[in-house]
Amino acid sequence: MYSPMVSADALLRCDVTYAGSTQVLETLAVNDPYTVPSVDIGGRFWFKAVMVGHAARVDYIKLYAYLDTRTQPLLIQEAIFLPPFKTTSPPTPLTGTQRLYAGPVGRELIYSCTLQGVQP
């Protein structure tokens, strides 16, 4: 059976908060970014964290945030991170705190991501 996960060496961890509820999303390096699913956040947003690479080598990271609309998810942010990444063993902040506002009443999605286990 094919698995897109290649290693647990590099770990991307994102804390995503909507309406006072926080979800912790942990992402491992994958070979194929198209196999990574989006995660429903409170029925209002979708969040997708993609880390492409192999083992502790990370080629790139892409983060996507979508507003869930009646017709289809609407992209409200795409963030792209390219090497070099810090190579420390404790988690390193990648994004800082991001606050996104979307929809007719300006709903707020908050997230921050850290990265650990990356090799040069």
Task: Indicate where each model-derived feature is located.
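N-terminal signal peptide c-region/cleavage motif recognized by signal peptidases
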Residues: 3-5
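Cysteine-centric segments in proteins
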Residues: 9-120
